[in-house]
From Swiss-Prot:
Family assignment from sequence similarity: Belongs to the PrsA family.
Topology class, membrane: Lipid-anchor
GO MF terms held by the record: peptidyl-prolyl cis-trans isomerase activity
KW Ribosomal protein (keyword) present: no
Organism in which the protein naturally occurs: Staphylococcus epidermidis (strain ATCC 35984 / DSM 28319 / BCRC 17069 / CCUG 31568 / BM 3577 / RP62A)
Record protein name field: Foldase protein PrsA
Lipidated residue numbers (N-palmitoyl cysteine): 21
Transmembrane annotation, as ranges: none
Lipid linkage positions (S-diacylglycerol cysteine): 21
Pfam families registered for this protein in UniProt: Rotamase
InterPro entries for the chain: Foldase_PrsA, PPIase_dom_sf, PPIase_PpiC, PrsA_foldase, Trigger_fact/SurA_dom_sf
EC number: 5.2.1.8
GO cellular component: plasma membrane
Keywords annotated in UniProt: Cell membrane, Isomerase, Lipoprotein, Membrane, Palmitate, Rotamase, Signal
């Protein structure tokens, strides 16, 4: 989940430094990391250069990883994670290409696997701490399909139509699917310019309230099961939306719940920071350095600060989906 990834920083060089302060060193912060005739480089020198916030972020990441792994290791199947990674490797054209992509991001395959495990632990934490009733799940989700006719943002764009032609085409398709709603998937596969959903008969799966842009969402949640919308305009183009029959609701319920929890946390980061605080209290986490404690409480565990970061990162616009959860 994106929000949690913003909070949990990667454990990189600073983690190695913190390791030097631990089992392989004495309690003094003046441990020598590198010696030379010109002078030594000590742990204290590097920590001063790095800054308290970076050290706090990395320290918190390490301790949280340990605590989450201890609490939820029996609830996360690493075989499922391995299967997911195999699928991703295939999508990238093989293991070598996938590892090359990770290397460009400063990660090894083992690092990536650990990150996915941490994400799975975080999801378990939120399932424990964030309440979502069956009624909420029903009221805030709809199984959805759509057909998209894209509008060119500029004349040189290879994909899409002019606004006028896109609207005319969408209106023509809308009349066709309104007459033959059972052929929606067939028509979506042929006409939709959203290639990823067109391959699945236009299916977007279960859409959660707050996940899509307002105009799309308002039209969708007015529909009864099996109904088709009028033409809906978004920044992407013109959509025809269908509320699909939810024959698989019970089997998909846990996935829908997870999506809804993520959407809740995206809107209210305090749910996540409170969950972290409860977990840290349960495991008697004790900050030995007052400055590090303050840095963690003022940034990582401050929901207002997280909200500010979210707003800064979302200023560039987000297309059809609002949060990208």
């Amino acid at each position: 989940m994106k929000l949690m990834n913003k909070i949990i920083v990667p454990v990189t060089a600073s983690a190695l430094l913190l390791g030097a302060c631990g089992s392989n060193a004495t309690e003094s912060k003046d441990n020598t990391l590198i010696s030379s005739k010109a002078g030594d480089v000590k742990v204290a020198d590097v920590m001063k250069k790095m800054g308290k916030e970076q050290i706090a972020n990395t320290s918190f990441s390490i301790v949280l990883n340990k605590v989450l792994a201890d609490k939820y290791k029996d609830k996360v199947d690493t075989k499922d994670i391995d299967k997911d990674i195999k699928k991703e490797e295939k999508q990238y054209g093989g293991k070598d290409q996938f590892e090359s992509m990770l290397k460009q991001q400063g990660m090894s395959l083992d690092d990536y696997k650990e990150q996915k495990k941490l994400s799975a632990y975080q999801k378990q934490l939120l399932l424990d701490k964030v309440n979502v009733s069956d009624k909420e799940i029903k009221e805030n989700s709809k199984k959805t399909s759509h057909i998209l006719i894209k509008v060119k943002s500029k004349s040189s764009d290879k994909e899409g139509l002019s606004d006028k032609k896109a609207k005319e085409k969408a209106e023509k398709i809308q009349k066709e699917v309104e007459k033959n709603p059972n052929k929606f998937g067939e028509i979506a596969k042929k006409e939709s310019m959203d290639s990823s959903s067109a391959k699945k008969d236009g299916s977007l799966g279960y859409v959660i309230k707050g996940q899509m842009v307002d105009s799309f969402e308002k039209a969708l949640f007015k529909l009864k099961e099996g109904e088709v919308s009028k033409v809906v305009k978004t920044d992407y183009g013109y959509h025809i939306i269908k509320a699909d029959k939810e024959t698989d609701f019970n089997s998909e319920k846990s996935n829908i719940k997870q999506k809804l929890i993520e959407e809740k946390v995206q809107k209210k980061p305090k749910l996540l920071t409170d969950a972290y605080k409860e977990l840290l209290k349960e495991y008697k986490v004790d900050y030995k350095d007052r400055d590090i404690k303050k840095a963690i409480e003022d940034s990582i565990l401050d929901p207002d600060k997280i909200k500010q970061q979210q707003q800064q990162q979302s200023q560039g616009g987000s297309g059809l989906t609002n949060s990208g959860s």
